[in-house]
């Protein structure tokens, strides 16, 4: 029985984690969880699982839940996230919080000796230079939940790091992979949220449409697997069957294949190094699929990808600016305040205006993130 804290339990990754846990009640126990604004969904989960420790974002929600459920322990805000991430009984923290907000709980959980199942890629994008040394210092396991990074992690089993020459990061292409640049000018939120393969939250689905998500994954892969940016290649793979691959020095290519089901990488992060059956899952039939396609991304239509490589190579505080500007612009697009193509334009503008801080501290990163968001809002007159 493994004791788990789930951060971001009402989101897409969080609810799929619940599905994994309910499928294996003898393997997993959720001892703590957090939610943002979806209190109705949180209460549904509370009715399914007797989770003792629960953190919420808003004071009003905290007051409501404390009164309604006197037998549960409730926590509030950022401090509450840290408290439930460092509980003595917690063995592994699955961090599925969206965005920069997931950083501090990850840091404190590592310091408390907890293994981390990381779905919050922004943590490594923004602060990989802090997280990776901390993970080594406290001798914890940092396990990827992103399907691509889980695939790379699985493909590396039995290989010596020095014998891996390249990472091949696959990409569905998002909602607009077949749209022209002209068609993208008036793309709507509804169109962007219609992902062809994966069921995900709104923010990451928009990020997939801009290819910002793949850019974030490139930066995450650099930190997770200690590879140079020149050795990370992105391939558009519309079928989302090959979740990513590695190329070895002898030219062998090793990959992980499967149906597009996020529960698989979630479950593997929780059971590593073992495997157990994935309940209610569909097995991959290559004969039914027949043909798999791979091609290079169009970096003129989707300039977020070269911008991400630029941010990663610049290093220091630049990935924080890339991420912060994107989080703000992504939200503005979902709120109907900017057009689709403006998202990446605003990221580029924020990067161009930024002077890189070489080795930013946590406090500096918090300020840089806030400044990038403020820059974007000011740029659009807000």
Protein language model regions, located:
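Catalytic, metal-anchored helix/loop core of enzyme active sites in primary metabolism
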Residues: 1-382
């Amino acid at each position: 029985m493994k004791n788990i804290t789930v951060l971001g339990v009402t989101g897409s990754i969080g609810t799929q984690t619940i599905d994994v846990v309910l499928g294996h009640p003898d393997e997993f126990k959720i001892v703590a969880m957090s939610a943002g604004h979806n209190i109705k969904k949180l209460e549904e989960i509370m009715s399914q699982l007797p989770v003792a420790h629960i953190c919420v974002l808003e004071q009003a929600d905290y007051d409501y839940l404390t009164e309604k459920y006197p037998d549960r322990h409730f926590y509030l805000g950022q401090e509450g996230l840290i408290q439930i991430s460092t509980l003595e009984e917690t063995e592994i923290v699955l961090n599925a919080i969206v965005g920069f907000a997931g950083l501090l709980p990850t840091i404190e959980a590592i310091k408390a000796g907890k293994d981390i199942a990381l779905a919050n890629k922004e943590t490594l994008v923004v602060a990989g230079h802090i997280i990776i040394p901390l993970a080594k210092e406290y001798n914890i396991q940092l396990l990827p939940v992103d399907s691509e990074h889980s695939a790379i992690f699985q493909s590396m089993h039995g290989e010596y790091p020095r014998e891996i020459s390249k990472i091949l990061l696959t990409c569905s292409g998002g909602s607009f992979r077949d749209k022209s640049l002209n068609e993208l000018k008036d793309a709507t939120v509804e169109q962007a949220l219609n992902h062809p393969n994966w069921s995900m939250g709104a923010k990451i689905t928009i990020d997939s449409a801009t290819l910002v998500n793949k850019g974030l994954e490139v930066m995450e892969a650099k930190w997770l697997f200690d590879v140079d940016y020149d050795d990370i290649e992105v391939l558009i793979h519309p079928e989302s069957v090959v979740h990513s691959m590695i190329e070895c020095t002898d030219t062998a290519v090793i990959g992980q294949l499967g149906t597009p089901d996020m529960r698989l990488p979630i479950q593997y992060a929780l059971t590593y190094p073992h495997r157990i059956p994935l309940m209610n899952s569909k097995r991959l039939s290559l004969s039914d699929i027949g043909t798999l396609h791979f091609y290079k991304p169009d970096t003129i239509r989707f300039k977020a990808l070269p911008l991400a490589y630029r941010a990663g190579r610049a290093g220091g505080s630049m990935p924080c600016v890339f991420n912060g500007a994107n989080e703000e612009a992504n939200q503005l697009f979902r709120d109907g305040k900017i057009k689709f193509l403006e998202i990446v334009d605003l990221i580029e503008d924020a990067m161009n205006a930024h002077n890189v801080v070489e080795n930013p501290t946590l406090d500096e990163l918090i300020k840089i993130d806030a400044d990038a968001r403020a820059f974007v809002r000011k740029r659009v007159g807000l």
